């Protein structure tokens, strides 16, 4: 957890910024993950934009076909007074993947304000090898 306080004119301190990374329970992390991603599946993922992530593929839909990952991390950051941004990053890495399977997939998800549904906002993988 990272906190930043700003000193006020009367000598008191007010929270100016907060962020933290936390354990998550939506994705099963498997350090010996074996790739189950194809290029077609990766290409079928839709990225939402940061102002409205809800046009991106839902995390829950991806987890139906890919429930295990190499790594997953959940973070919360303040954006404005009283508002928090929730993000999830997931990586799938198998550098000895069998033919037809991807060696690496990295996905980043955001939520809409006041919503706990994660939507895909960024993906990278097969073209970056």
Regions found by a protein language model. Name each.
Residues 1-129:
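Residues within mature, well-folded domains
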